[in-house]
Amino acid sequence: MAAPEPLSPAGGAGEEAPEEDEDEAEAEDPERPNAGAGGGRSGGGGSSVSGGGGGGGAGAGGCGGPGGALTRRAVTLRVLLKDALLEPGAGVLSIYYLGKKFLGDLQPDGRIMWQETGQTFNSPSAWATHCKKLVNPAKKSGCGWASVKYKGQKLDKYKATWLRLHQLHTPATAADESPASEGEEEELLMEEEEEDVLAGVSAEDKSRRPLGKSPSEPAHPEATTPGKRVDSKIRVPVRYCMLGSRDLARNPHTLVEVTSFAAINKFQPFNVAVSSNVLFLLDFHSHLTRSEVVGYLGGRWDVNSQMLTVLRAFPCRSRLGDAETAAAIEEEIYQSLFLRGLSLVGWYHSHPHSPALPSLQDIDAQMDYQLRLQGSSNGFQPCLALLCSPYYSGNPGPESKISPFWVMPPPEMLLVEFYKGSPDLVRLQEPWSQEHTYLDKLKISLASRTPKDQSLCHVLEQVCGVLKQGS
């Protein structure tokens, strides 16, 4: 057995992938002269270790008369209603986010009324941001057009349809603009996975799907024409703390430096042993193509010794765009895992011509996979990611660089931060009874459970300090 380097946490987006923060004015109308959307803003950030944010919106030009440039940011719900692509109705809009469902009414003027509270919102992004912040207070933007569904279909599709219908009347520069919102691809993937959870798909069933990339995802930018030597642009890794907020200028393929557990004064949460056969097959697979490769890792998790043993690699022998072949390969791998008595313990992929460091997109995916493998139980189930860089010019020699990484859960998962701003948050200063507030009750209840080696006053001071910071 060959043990890899100690695992390193990497910056990531937690539960959310990069997304767009759209700020649409209620009065926008592409048929009005000189109407246009505002410029971009940065999206949400995350923790200094692993948080990761969303992207900001793109600037948009005006779209007035016949010579005006048509842009996707000029499309609003009111425009889609006016052109009969949408119809107003009760409960026709929905958001699924981290196991929560929100329903909204589409009003004739293009506004959204949230059924639960009766609040109205001027745009999908405003509603999505509000709802997502209730579930995850650290959320900075809502990616409304990718998050909100109209009668089961994402609003992005209706926006794209509207743009296609109007491209015949626009200049070539406008026709070249992508109808899909930039930076939303990861958000779309994440929301599809959330829907699988809502539909009752178990972690075991989900293991049949590739952990690396969606089969329909286009080839990685590193893919090149066969027979040509690669002179790809060097992707310079950045430290997570230097990222700041993630806007549209931040490429999801931006590489992020990993940090050792020792550097952040934390113990490695589990030990890892990897079979040399796994490293051999991963290295071999990565050398065969100039494009990224993806595969599964099978092994066992020993709860008592906190040891994750990776015993076999299962390459996905399909192209990223070949969904039909991918489904058959996934089923074959699933059966192989089952027959060998192995569990799905992780995934691997390659960066052919870049350092063996995770990208923002990789980090987003890894965090989601960690949560998915853990499932609904409280038991800890690790998920390991391996990265191979076979042709990176910065490698010390001909030998490929193989690196493991694991994403440290972001601090917004702390309990106080998690519930902060939620509608069902207990207001500790309010009276619980005639004699006590909710805070008094909490102190009395915790007093009987204070650790023996710590003083009661010290523990309660710490608890109260945390509560004050979260209020």
Swiss-Prot record:
Biased composition annotated in UniProt, kind: Low complexity: 1-10
Enzyme class name: hydrolase
Domain (RAMA): residue spans on this chain: 71-166
EC number(s) per entry: 3.4.-.-
Modified residues (Phosphoserine): S8, S178, S181
Subunit structure, interactors included: Monomer. Mainly monomoric, but when binds to dsDNA, forms homotetramer assembled into two homodimers. May interact with histones; this interaction is facilitated by dsDNA binding.
Example GO molecular function: metal-dependent deubiquitinase activity
Record field: compositional bias (Acidic residues): 16-29, 182-197
Residues bearing the modification N-acetylalanine: A2
A GO biological process held by the record: double-strand break repair
Role played: Probable protease. Acts as a sensor of N(6)-methyladenosine methylation on DNA (m6A): recognizes and binds m6A DNA, leading to its degradation. Binds only double strand DNA (dsDNA) in a sequence-independent manner.
Bias (Gly residues) ranges: 36-63
Ranges where the MPN domain occurs: 272-407
PTM comment, free text: Degraded following binding to N(6)-methyladenosine methylated DNA (m6A).
Disordered: annotated span: 1-63, 170-229
Keywords associated with the record: Acetylation, Hydrolase, Metal-binding, Metalloprotease, Phosphoprotein, Protease, Zinc
Domain of life: Eukaryota
Binding, Zn(2+): H349, H351, D362
Residues in coiled coil: none
Motif (JAMM motif): 349-362
Domain observations: The RAMA domain recognizes and binds N(6)-methyladenosine methylation on DNA (m6A). The RAMA domain mediates interaction with histones.
Name of the protein in its database record: MPN domain-containing protein
